[in-house]
């Protein structure tokens, strides 16, 4: 049997509290965030101690059952002289009946999400395409404002996207659609991760989410996922840091859990 000091237990409790503020990542992912971030009041060892003392975080398990020294300032990435070309894989996701458009930039794996009109499914096809086009252009504009150049948008055979393709091409965007029913795998994996994390957050709450809170919870989950360093990343930095230039900060980024 292993024994822990009072200080070790207190840090383990703090680590478990911050895990909720991160949207319930698994412990290994949380360790990556802490190791590459700043201003955390605990270390990766404290996360491991928390798993030994309390067991693995239950909400992070249940959410997936369905299928570093303090710095005085916030470091911001200086934009490159030349825009970086990106491919953006996109798809439409439904959470609690609410439609979202999800975009994943490659090779940065930065996730973008926008909620569509809640009456999206009841709209005529022409109106649906206008809603989708507006959301896509907002995402593209956000990337261009950070000196990135989305040169290719990849979709599956969504009818709403097919109808707005000419308008997107007129604005200089190349749209590539895969065969109908052949979903873009990178987006499918991301959507699965978003839904798993959303379920973990939902299970931690003592109340039912309204439509507005559902949107806010999805945005919260995506924000947390963008702070997570991919296991296959060669640079060792999070997607948020790669795009926004903001290093993960334990003091400012995880003050509160959702709800």
Task: Locate the predicted segments by residue.
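Surface-exposed, charged/polar loop-rich segments
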Residues: 180, 187-233
